[in-house]
């Protein structure tokens, strides 16, 4: 039997986080959620996710700070930024910092 892929959702808006996690569970993924950058980093190191979905507007730190701490790690999982920030400069910055994709919500 195959193990479920683990996806870490770092998103402070509970409604959005719950929606994403429910959709992932329905698609047979194991979703774990964090509502802050520090919690997200802690869960990243304890669960070794296969993918990270990262919001940039977090309450305790900017998502780019989380991204910079995740980039270049030997166990680096792909990171998809999901943000309300739609300026082209924000997208370019996140991609330059190591994000694998950027989706505007």
Report residues per predicted region.
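Charged docking surfaces used in two-component/phosphorelay signaling
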Residues: 18-26
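Conserved acidic carboxylate
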Residues: 11
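Non-catalytic signal-transmission and effector/linker regions of two-component phosphorelay proteins
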Residues: 1-8
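Acidic, metal-coordinating helix/loop segments flanking the phosphotransfer/catalytic sites
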Residues: 8, 33-51, 72
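Active-site residues of response regulator receiver
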Residues: 55, 83
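The feature encodes the CheY-like receiver
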Residues: 59, 87, 105
């Amino acid at each position: 039997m195959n193990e479920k892929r683990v996806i870490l959702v770092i998103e402070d808006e509970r409604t959005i986080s719950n929606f994403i996690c429910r959709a992932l569970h329905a698609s047979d993924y194991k979703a774990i959620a964090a509502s802050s950058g520090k919690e997200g980093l802690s869960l990243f190191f304890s669960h070794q996710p296969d993918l990270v979905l990262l919001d940039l507007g977090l309450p305790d730190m900017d998502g780019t700070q989380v991204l910079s701490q995740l980039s270049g790690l030997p166990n680096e999982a792909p990171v998809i930024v999901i943000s309300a920030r739609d300026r082209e400069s924000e997208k370019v910055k996140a991609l330059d910092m190591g994000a694998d994709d950027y989706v505007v919500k």
